[in-house]
Regions:
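Core alpha/beta nucleotide-donor-binding catalytic domains of modification enzymes
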Residues: 1-118
Length: 118
């Protein structure tokens, strides 16, 4: 079963323990939604962070809604943040990937410190 394989992998590689509070970053794509389900079904302590970079119009907004709904269904905290990525790219001259990476990593770091996530 997938949950058993996931649990075994986490333990074998020492990724985190049941005592850790994990900040799980969830895009709304299949892989991160499966990870959300696995973490919840195995009883890990975690919160969900979702970035809306506002680059795909309504699809970006739909992902935000889906992630928030699933986090609520599992009873875990959900933090959503919208970034004006296009304006940030214009301001800094960075590529879309670099601007989005810098924005999300800074936010994830701040969330982790503020809420005690590892």
């Amino acid at each position: 079963m997938l949950t058993d394989r996931f649990q075994s992998y986490v333990e074998r590689h020492g990724l985190f323990s049941r005592d850790d509070r994990i900040l799980l970053t969830v895009s709304g794509g299949v892989d991160s939604m499966v990870l959300l389900s696995l973490m919840a079904s195995l009883g890990y302590r975690f919160g969900v962070a979702h970035c809306n970079f506002q680059l795909r119009g309504a699809e970006s907004d739909e992902d935000e809604v889906i992630v928030a709904r699933e986090a609520a269904r599992y009873g875990v905290p959900c933090y959503n943040r919208r970034f004006d990525t296009a304006a940030e790219m214009e301001r800094t001259g960075e590529s879309m990937e670099m601007a989005a990476r810098r924005l999300r990593y800074a936010w994830f770091d701040a969330l982790s410190r503020e809420h005690g996530y590892t």
